[in-house]
Amino acid sequence: MTPTIRPLIAGNWKMHGTESSLGELKAIGSGFVEAAGAGADGVICVPATLLARASDILAKTPVATGGQDCHPATSGAHTGDIAAEMLADCGASYVIVGHSERRTDHHEADEDVAAKAEAAWRAGLTAIICIGETKIQREAGETLSVLSRQIAGSVPPGATAKNSVIAYEPVWAIGTGLTPTVEDVAQAHAHLRAELGMKLGIEADGMRLLYGGSVKPSNAGELLSILNVDGALIGGASLKAADFLAISAAVKGK
């Protein structure tokens, strides 16, 4: 972690969760400070169908809510899409943009991700901008060049430490149980900090860099001890309060 940066533990429920799942949110909200301490932030990005209810449940807790995607436009004939303003209207404070599953399933390019980040800012949301290399790119030794290209294309010039969070998610590690080595994560996050510094100047010094990719209670302590890893973007492990809080505990006192 970076000593001067307040860590963020973010959960991404993806396409999981119905009303019966809301009890897990209550447990996360009530247990977060005890687990992570008062010096960390938490957010759960739920499906749009749960967002308003999740926001009500977490309203008096230190855990915020977020969306998982937004359309660049404020409104219009975009059936099935959700504007950032609509997420904010449901109580969201954050929104994930550019997740690898969106890039793959919906063929989103870097410029699409940048437009969504700007839409998030317009609505007063913090954008969690996701980047990361595929297995083929990794095996070809292209990890750092891919990250440079995605920082250049996916992070708009107006990004600040307040309106943006960067999440590094090696695509090959998501949902597979595989994680890069400590050395690989450290190298990637140091590279991201340097690239952001060249693009954004001093703002990059305070920007939170999250690691995402099969984060679980058993590896959270090691991952969150790495310099420039300022929190985590958690997938499956965020669906259960016990797992999310166990991961959150890894930042306590750091």
UniProtKB/Swiss-Prot annotation:
Physiological role: Involved in the gluconeogenesis. Catalyzes stereospecifically the conversion of dihydroxyacetone phosphate (DHAP) to D-glyceraldehyde-3-phosphate (G3P).
Query: What Enzyme Commission number(s) apply to this enzyme?
Result: 5.3.1.1
The annotated pathway is: Carbohydrate biosynthesis; gluconeogenesis; Carbohydrate degradation; glycolysis; D-glyceraldehyde 3-phosphate from glycerone phosphate: step 1/1
Protein name per Swiss-Prot or TrEMBL: Triosephosphate isomerase
Task: Tell me which residues bind substrate.
Answer: N12, W13, K14, G175, S214, G235, G236
The record's listing under SUPFAM superfamilies reads: Triosephosphate isomerase (TIM)
Please give the catalytic activity noted in the UniProt record. D-glyceraldehyde 3-phosphate = dihydroxyacetone phosphate
Active site annotated at which positions?
H99, E169
Source species, please? Chelativorans sp. (strain BNC1)
Record note on quaternary structure: Homodimer.
NCBIfam families, per database record: tim
Named from the GO MF annotations, one term is: triose-phosphate isomerase activity
Question: Which terms are listed as keywords in the entry?
Answer: Cytoplasm, Gluconeogenesis, Glycolysis, Isomerase
- Which InterPro entries is this protein grouped with? Aldolase_TIM, TIM_sf, TrioseP_Isoase_bac/euk, Triosephosphate_isomerase, Triosephosphate_isomerase_AS
Q: Do the record's keywords include Ubl conjugation?
A: no
Enzyme class, broadest EC rank:
isomerase
Biological process, per Gene Ontology: gluconeogenesis; glyceraldehyde-3-phosphate biosynthetic process; glycerol catabolic process; glycolytic process
Family membership, please give it.
Belongs to the triosephosphate isomerase family.
Q: Pull one GO CC term from this UniProt entry.
A: cytosol
Q: Name one Pfam family in it.
A: TIM
